[in-house]
Amino acid sequence: MSREQRGPNEKLGTVLALAGISNAGLARRVNDLGAQRGLTLRYDKTSVARWVAKGMVPQGAAPHLIAAAIGAKLGRPVPLHEIGLADADPAPEVGLAFPRDVGEAVRSATELYRLDLAGRRGGGGIWQSLAGSFSVSAYATPASRWLITPADPSVARDPTAAQAAILGARGGGSGSPGGAGARGPGAAPDARGAHLLHPGGATPGAAGSVPLQPGPEAVADASPLRVGHSDVSKLREAAQDARRWDSKYGGGDWRSSMVPECLRVDAAPLLLGSYTDEVGRALFGASAELTRLAGWMAFDTGQQEAAQRYYIQALRLARAAADVPLGGYVLASMSLQATYRGFADEGVDLAQAAVERNRGLATARTMSFFRLVEARAHAKAGDAPAAGAALKGAESWLERSRAGDSDPPWLGFYGYDRFAADAAECYRDLKAPRQVRRFTEQALSRPTEEFVRSHGLRLVVSAVAELESGNLDAACAAGTRAVEVAGRISSARTTEYVRDLLHRLEPYGDEPRVAELRERARPLLVTPG
């Protein structure tokens, strides 16, 4: 469906001519990009002619897909306003900026937190309308700016600047969705105590662990908070809880979904407060951890557009924290997303940026993880020698790590079992089933209760390796266990792995074992991940 504009869209016509894309070629590319994102689109050259000659504006994700298709041909990002479709975007550029100024960085992050709130209150409409807008080229500027300057010189904010920031947030920045409604109660709450982790130490799932919704009185006073180390500690505790919930229950579980709420209710007013440089660095670090987690959870639930925006803001906050290893961790997350979305070369670049900037700074275990992420990208690109070298480097760094090293808390998930699991996926992409089986056996030998999702993913990789080795019985057995695990968590990524396994089993569809596995997986595949 399309809605009408006034007059021809000359901007779109001009850019199409510049890119050398025909109407039929653009329609075909938009349909293909939509299919990659689970959308069924049937545009043709006549559709494109209407967009250009009559100014018709396609609805839903189409404007972003058009921009992505043209951007891929031009080799650079193409914003919607350049192709005359800015009005189609409910949140133009929100979360995609990587400001040089610290104050603008705070504004950019808190705008994103409000955007996510508006999306949730509207039934996810904003993220649905942005479906298909993920563009790996949007990572280019953030990555290059971070590489040049991985740490801001000062982040202290005095009360006067903090008060101005609060008033600015209340007024709503450009691009805030929903007009006044998005700038109402909750835009810049001014009260402590509504923490994801209850101050009294409530356990996950208890009523006190849910962030409180601030009422109108919460923003009645523009007096800025004076942020202290205790405030930062509560954010770090929240991040620790969220990491545990995500690993155990998946990014779509209700516990994990409270992270964006924590950012809006708890982190935003602190970021808009006043603080010394020392406290500010710690605050930006804790906020960066939570923001990266929000991106990771969005990635796990298939919301690639939200994930990309959170990752960009997390990288900017890590720069303000002067935490180079954390910035590298965000780049590694970007790399994994780019690789997963089919942009392996860009995934290599992002991972290598994390590695090179952290030489002499990060712990051995941290460097090992960055090299492992690099290996994943090389393997996806089909570069076996480069993947092997990166895996060897990752293993070497891991062997050099020691229990007493000052590893960051966010790396608690990483050990030899995770190395083995990712090595197995590398060899799966390189079509080396014998190596896949060897590393998968090692990965599955560890306890699974804390990392349920990872266990499910490893079982699927094991099933694929068994299938490629000609062991149908073993493949179905591992697949059955994977389906059982996937049914216990909320993870679109895990469901996608299961779907891929079933696709690989289609040539054996007449086998009773395969039919039984498909039947077991049916409830999982019809339930939103």
Curated annotation (Swiss-Prot):
GO biological process: sporulation resulting in formation of a cellular spore
DNA-binding region listed in the record: 13-31
Source organism: Streptomyces griseus
Protein name: 55.5 kDa and 49.5 kDa sporulation proteins
Biased composition, class Gly residues, residue ranges: 169-184
InterPro entries xref list: TPR-like_helical_dom_sf
UniProt entry keywords in alphabetical sequence: Sporulation
Function: Might be a catalyst/regulator pair of proteins involved in the temporal controlled sporulation process. The decrease in level of the smaller protein early in sporulation may relieve negative regulation of the activity of the larger protein.
Statement: the UniProt record of this protein carries the keyword Lyase: no
Residue ranges, annotated region (Disordered): 167-226
